[in-house]
């Protein structure tokens, strides 16, 4: 059985605990879908002020990202490469941290409550296979500390997926 720890109020300590929890969850599990599903649940239930956490996977033949495991309201199923925050992060291969999604050109509004967003590329064996997308109903929700630790979260997940 798994238990999600309560937030202590110390953001860095909370993220360090989150990383340990992810490592424990993925340590002996080789099924990718299970690991992505549990990772999205862990983020959704651990991070404050988050209304969506999940993954989109690249379908190269279609030029689109397709919805994967997530927590939150039903979401857009397909996002073209280079469109919206997710498609831009995938196309550029870098983190997109958006303080106000309404000011982002071409933002795709899957949930009208979302006000800020962070999207991180997910790589397996060096190749971008998709993105981790986290939304918040609060503007300016994600800062440098979030980006630092969520990048480590993605890297920890990538190691588990490479097994």
Swiss-Prot record:
Signal peptide: none
The organism's place on the tree of life at top rank: Bacteria
InterPro entries, A to Z: FRMsr_CS (IPR000614), GAF (IPR003018), GAF-like_dom_sf (IPR029016), Phosphatase_reg/MetRdx (IPR051330)
One of the record's GO cellular component terms: cytosol
One Pfam assignment: GAF_2
Transmembrane segments annotated in the record for this chain: none
PROSITE patterns linked to this entry: UPF0067 (PS01320)
UniProt GO MF annotations: L-methionine-(R)-S-oxide reductase activity
Family label: Belongs to the free Met sulfoxide reductase family.
Protein name according to UniProt: Protein YtsP
Encoding gene, per UniProt annotation: ytsP
